[in-house]
Amino acid sequence: MKDMPKSDKLIARLREIVGEAHVIQDPDKLKAYAVDGKKPKVVVTPGTTDEVSRVVDYASQEHRAIVPRGSGSKIKMGGIPKKMDIVLSTSQLNRIRDRDCENLTLSAESGLTLCEVQQGLAKVGKGYFLPLDPPFTDKATLGGIVATNSSGPKRMLYGTARDMIIGVKAVFPNGDIVVSGGKTVKNVSGYDMCKLLIGSYGTLGILCEMTFKLLPLPEKEATLGLSFARLEDADGFVRELRGSQLIPSSIEILNGLAVQKMSHSMSMPPNGNYLVAVGLEGVVESIDRQVSEMSEMAKKYGTLEAVTLDAEKHQAFWVALRNFSSRLTDEYSNVISMKSNFLISKCGEVLGSYEKIAQGLGINCAYISHAGNGILYSHVLPGKNFRSRIESFVELIEKMTAEAVKNEGSLVVESSPISIKKKVDVWGQSRSDYLVVRRLKDQIDPAGILNIGRFVGGI
C-alpha cells in the first residue's frame, strides 16, 4: 500500500474498514453527494460506531477532510466547503437501540429518519412520539436534526432537540468515541457534551447514537385557520393569543404568496392577504373550547373567515408547511431561503419591514413566521432574470440582516445559489462568541478535517 497513489490508498483503506459494498467512487454516483458544486473523492457508509471511529481516525492521520451527511435534506445549509475528500454517510446507522416507553426514553442511531421513529412509536400502546417537527420531516435524520438543532412550529410548546436530548454517542475528529448522558432524564454531572454537539453542524464530531425524551401522543390534534386583510390585524390577534391563558402548540403567520404556493395541499380560508394557523393538541374538550375562544378573539381583529382542520387535513397542512422550502426548490431554480430570529414581540413588525424592503427592490417573497417562536422564514422567488439581478438579491439579504439585528436578532441564509454564497456571509453578522467557537474548534479538531468552511466564520 505504501507505493500506491494517495487516492488509491484512501479507497483501499476505506474498503478495509467498511467493506467494498459501502464505498462509493463511481463519478456519476458521486455527483449526488456534491456540495455547492464540489464533489467528494469518495463516499463511505459505515454501519457501526466503531467503523465511523476507524474512518475518522484514518482521515485525521492522512489530513483528509470529511463532510458528514444524513439524508442530505440540510446539505445546502452553511458556507461553501473549503475541502471535501470524504462524504461520510450515516445511512447505515439506522437502528433503534432501545425503546423504553415506560420510562419515556428512546435510543436510536443517527441515520434513522424522524418519520420512521414516529411511525414506530405511534404503534406502541396508546402511542408515543418524539416532540420534534423540523422541516423535511419525512427525510430528516435524527443526526441531521440534532447537528443543525433544526426545529419547527411546535418549538413553541415543546422546545428543540436541545430540550429533548439526554444522551449521545459521537466520534470526535481524532477518532475517539465519546459517550455523554444516558437514559436518566436529570443527568447533570460533569460537562454536558450533548449540548456542545447540538447545532455544531458536524464541525466538532459525528453523531452516531442519541437518547431522547418521549411523550404520550395527545388524544386529539387540530388546526384553526384564520384569514385577515391586514398584517396589523393578524399580528394583533397573535399578540393577544400569546398573552392569553390558551395553550397552542404552534402559531404561524403566512403572507398571501406563501398561502398561494401551499394551496395545493390546504383546506384553509382562501380570502385575505394573511393566514394565521394555530396548532392545538390535547383532550377533545380542551381543543373544542380553545377553538371557540380563539375564534371569538379573532373577531375583534376583523377576521374574514375561520376554518378548523381535523385528522388528515390537519396533518396534511403541517406536512406541507414543513416541506414548503423543498417544494419551492423543486418548482423553481435559484430559490433563496433565509431564516431570521428575533424577539417574539417583534414578529409582525419585522415581517412588515421585510415586505417593504422586498417590495422596494421589486422582489417576490413568500413569508412563513413561527410567530410563537420569534422565527421568520423568507423565501425569495427570483424569477427568470436571476443572473442580472444578483446585486439586488444581495442588497435584499443585507437590508433584511440589518433589520433583524436592529430587533435584537440575526439572519441566516439557509439555501441559495453558489453565486449568492460567494457574495454574502450566509451566517450573517459576526457573533460576540465567535472567538469561543473558534477556540473550541481548534481544540477539538486541530487537524481541521470536519466540515471545514461550512460553519460560522468559515470554521
Please describe what each predicted stretch is.
Residues 2-4, 39, 64, 69-71, ...:
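Conserved glycine-rich FAD pyrophosphate-binding loop
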Residues 14, 34-66, 84, 90-136, ...:
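N-terminal glycine-rich flavin-associated loop
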Residues 33-36, 77-82, 266-268:
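Short glycine-biased active-site loop of nucleotidyltransferases that positions the nucleotide triphosphate
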Residues 147, 166-331:
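C-terminal substrate-binding/cap subdomain adjacent to the FAD-binding core in PCMH-type
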Residues 21-35, 66:
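N-terminal glycine-rich anion-binding loops that anchor highly charged ligand groups
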